[in-house]
Amino acid sequence: MTFQGKTLLITGGTGSFGNAVLNRFLATDIAEIRVFSRDEKKQDDMRHEFQAKLPEAAGKIKFYIGDVRDLASVKSAMVGVDYVFH
């Protein structure tokens, strides 16, 4: 299966499962991976980690602050998304 040109949203993306999913999809031809979580500090730490260890892939990762219990934040993060890992 090819993910070329596709966008993935990972809810709870800064947790251990979300991090594993992120690392798995960075090895594909996916266009964009959105990390959706409530914790801005963890997102900032993750951003810096990937910029340091995989600078060529870090541009694929976008970060969205939100909560799955808040419909507006979910709708905002979902625009243009092809796949969701929840």
Where are these regions (language model features)?
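Conserved Rossmann-fold cofactor-binding substructure of NAD(P)-dependent oxidoreductases
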Residues: 48, 56-83
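Redox-cofactor binding/interface segments in oxidoreductases and associated redox assembly factors
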Residues: 86
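Conserved Rossmann-like nucleotide-binding pocket used by diverse enzymes
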Residues: 9, 34, 64
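Active-site catalytic pocket residues across diverse enzymes, especially alpha/beta-hydrolases
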Residues: 25, 29, 50, 54
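Short, flexible hinge/linker loops that cap or flank conserved catalytic cores
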Residues: 1-2
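Short, well-ordered alpha-helix to beta-strand connector turns
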Residues: 5-6, 81
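Conserved glycine-rich Rossmann-like NAD(P)H-binding loop of the short-chain dehydrogenase/reductase
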Residues: 29-45
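N-terminal Rossmann NAD(P)H-binding glycine-rich loop of SDR-like oxidoreductase domains
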Residues: 6-28
